[in-house]
Amino acid sequence: MEVLKTLKFLTLVLLAFFVVIYVLIVSYVYFNQVEMIFQSAALPKNYQFDYQQNFEELNIKSFDDANLNGLLFKTENSKGLVFYLHGNAGTLETWGKMAKTYTNLGYDIFILDYRSFGKSEGEIENEEQLNQDISIAYKTLCSRYPENKIIIAGYSIGSGLATILASENKPKALILQSPYFSFTELSSSRVPFFPDFMKKFHLETFEHLPKINVPIYIFHGTDDQLIPYENSVRLNKLLKSNGHFYPLKNQGHIGMNENEDFQNQLKIILQ
């Protein structure tokens, strides 16, 4: 009898121990999820961007007066603008190098640094705040370009943000590079024990994509190990007649803008 009581007691102690460990781990993930998703890096406020092409540095006030920094690269006789949302790492110091991908094809391109990235102020807190920032930046560029000449583009984490933005506006087209079907689902594959209701970022691309009536172009590398290719295969099934899917053979997650097949197809799209 005493042995049975002892076993029950030890079982309860072990259960309590594992519960405490679980709560501690979940709490850590909850309070650090922004840093786990966004690998931001700051640049000095007096940092001078150095690119061998014409560009303008823009500072846009967000809803809470936080300053959002972006670069507008310009080309002669521009056909329009590409509003570009980059991935979860890197700043305009490096992302600006890909601007020529679009300026060489006759389009101006605006690249935004999210909060805490580069020279942008503030800290990212949640999905709603991030979407508000992006919407304000987009409306600012709409005051310079007719919206029917603006193409929204997003790479990696930026793909879900771009999809939401396009679903709430009327751009010329939407270009997605290495998109995820659902960020909620993608993050669960990385941290399966973390409850969905505690996540600050859901970014359900699959929910917003069907709402978009302008041309949609999806590019995904077949060798992508970060956001598996299957994500775009599933998104492709949701596309209507306005959708186009371009698999890029042997392409990983990084470096798509330098991919020759991507560049050739982009040339056709933007002609």
Label each PLM-derived region with a short phrase.
Residues 223-227, 253-254:
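Acidic catalytic loop of the alpha/beta-hydrolase fold
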Residues 251-261:
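Catalytic histidine-centered segment of alpha/beta-hydrolase-like enzymes
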Residues 18-61:
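An N-terminal hydrophobic leader/cap segment in hydrolases
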Residues 145-156:
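Alpha/beta-hydrolase fold nucleophile elbow
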Residues 212, 218-220, 224:
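Short beta-strand/loop motif that positions the catalytic acidic residue
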Residues 159-214, 260:
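Hydrolase active-site cap/lid region
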Residues 63-140:
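Membrane-embedded segments
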Residues 98, 205, 214, 228-237:
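Short alpha-helix in the alpha/beta-hydrolase fold that links the catalytic acid
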